[in-house]
Amino acid sequence: MEFEKLANLFSKLETISDKTRKVQYIARFLKELKDQYKETLLLLQGTVFYPWEQKNLGIAEKGVIRAISIAYGIEKQKVEELFIKYGDLGIVAEKACEMRKQKPLLLKPLTVKDVYQTLRKIADIEGEGSQDKKIITFAKLLVNAKPKEAKYIVRLALEELRIGVGEGIIRDAIAIAFSVTPEAVEYAYSILLDFGEVVRIAKEQGEQGLWQVKLQVGRPFRVMLAIRARNVQEAFDIVGRPAMIEAKYDGFRLQIHKKGDQVWLWTRRLEDVTRQFPDVVNIVRNRVKANEIIFEAEAVGYDKKTNKFLPFQKISQRVKRKYDIEKMAKEIPVELHAFDIVYLEGEQLMKKPFKERRALLEKVIDEKEHEIQLSIGIIEKDDKKAYQFYQDCLNKGLEGVMFKNLNAPYQPGRRVGYMVKLKPTLETLDLVIVAAEWGEGKRSGWLTSFTVAALDKDTGNYLEVGEVGTGIKEKKERAEDITFEELTELLKPYIYKQEGKKVYVKPKIVVEVAYEEIQESPRYKSGFALRFPRIVRIRFDRSPKEIDTIDRIKQIYEMQRGGIHKQ
């Protein structure tokens, strides 16, 4: 398929604000799609990489400016002036393409595959002189582009497509195009993480095919998520009685895949951390009695001297570490607490009830202290006994407890009433930082006030819900402390615009934010604002696609209005 067709779709979607109309346009487009499903659907998501691929093109704005200059024979200074004028390098590329003095005699039509493969190729260029090679390769792609194509190729390269299309809209469009349910599309995508494959299955096999997609060892999936409960009674009301009540550990949730001696470790945000945890790989090889298995566990750091658990921020150092890995493994050892299993020796287990999955997990885990153990848990129906177990967990320094429906299947990628978490803290939200302000006086040189946003899952946009500057320290006194300097260094690479003291950053850094209540507010696009927000911690284990949604914020607000929600 010619890329021009996809660029025309992008252009149309960019002008439409109504979600229903966006869905209809994409559905019509998908119905006519004959091939190149993988490439087309990834580009529609504004990327050329699958969610589990830790890759990027490695071309920043300066490199794109050079590529535009080379491709269209325009002075670099002129390109920079256009950027100042329009503030969007996609539009700059479109204008520069229209302005070029010497057009190719034979303009070869670009295909979707051409664009996809070239952008992937750029990401793979490494070594000496790689930046120049990337820019030349990108410039060659732009040479063959028409103005509108150039606009979206540049935006794709910068991962800023700006067409207001997220997973929710794509899900609904696939459902309409092929007469299947959105639930079936979402289920299949949560396992495959490939909308191109989901489209192919929906087209060829329909609803039944989507519900029958299978997990593959060595390929990650989206894990099941918990909803929150405010007390023991509410937790039982959601999951039913009796329930499995398990300790909630303050660590990193891992999905662990094993095939023979090969082991893969992924975090919740689908980050491959196999290399960072050689000790965990050895534990799985030696203590998990299965040839092929996919299970979940919490990796928790502990202090060798005191035998006490370490705070989450301490173990997060290991996830970020790229060197001295063996040394770090000795300094911050971790142990695994296994809590669920979804695949064993060729058998798909997601549709089995939790009590059966737990029994299978118990059979394959060869427990050893400070290596791997099953999560501590009890089966209970009594409020008082459940509350006592909850208090016991808190007294041991654990984060809280999980209540689980004994008869529930495993629902990947969704917050459903099959498991809930109960913690003693204020209500918190996982949000992404989208803007900040430079400090003054002794805080000059640091970003000190942070604008946080929630996800509109349909459009993929991030809508602001407040500004927060508390919960952050000037000096690090404990391992779990967050400093202004630390947040500033994390955000600096993602600054893309500055207006006076305010900077705008790409939505990359996720923080957990506590608050007193949610209020309606015309100040923010979301229509809501957090009252007395405070940053609790940086969520290195959360991706921007996993943060709390606007729907979640609306839900909490409605609960408050009904007098149900009490802090």
Swiss-Prot record:
User: What's the Enzyme Commission number for this chain?
Assistant: 6.5.1.1
The active site is formed by K248
Xref: PROSITE patterns: DNA_LIGASE_A3
Identify the keywords attached in UniProt to this record, alphabetized: ATP-binding, Cell cycle, Cell division, DNA damage, DNA recombination, DNA repair, DNA replication, Ligase, Magnesium, Metal-binding, Nucleotide-binding
Q: Which GO terms describe its molecular function?
A: ATP binding; DNA binding; DNA ligase (ATP) activity; metal ion binding
Needed cofactors, names only, are: Mg(2+)
Name the top EC class.
Answer: ligase
Entry's Gene Ontology BP terms = cell division; DNA biosynthetic process; DNA recombination; DNA repair; lagging strand elongation
Which Gene3D superfamilies has this protein been placed in? Answer: DNA ligase, ATP-dependent, N-terminal domain, DNA ligase/mRNA capping enzyme, Nucleic acid-binding proteins
* Xref: InterPro entries: ATP-dep_DNA_ligase (IPR050191), DNA_ligae_ATP-dep_bac/arc (IPR022865), DNA_ligase_ATP-dep (IPR000977), DNA_ligase_ATP-dep_C (IPR012309), DNA_ligase_ATP-dep_cent (IPR012310), DNA_ligase_ATP-dep_N (IPR012308), DNA_ligase_N_sf (IPR036599), NA-bd_OB-fold (IPR012340)
Binding residues for ATP: E246, R253, R268, E298, F339, R415, K421
A Pfam family the protein falls into: DNA_ligase_A_C
Query: Which residues lie in coiled coils?
Result: none
The entry sums up its family as follows:
Belongs to the ATP-dependent DNA ligase family.
Function statement: DNA ligase that seals nicks in double-stranded DNA during DNA replication, DNA recombination and DNA repair.
Extract the HAMAP family matched here.
Answer: DNA_ligase
Q: What protein am I looking at?
A: DNA ligase
Tell me the classification of the organism that encodes this protein: Archaea, Nanobdellota, Candidatus Nanoarchaeia, Nanoarchaeales, Nanoarchaeaceae
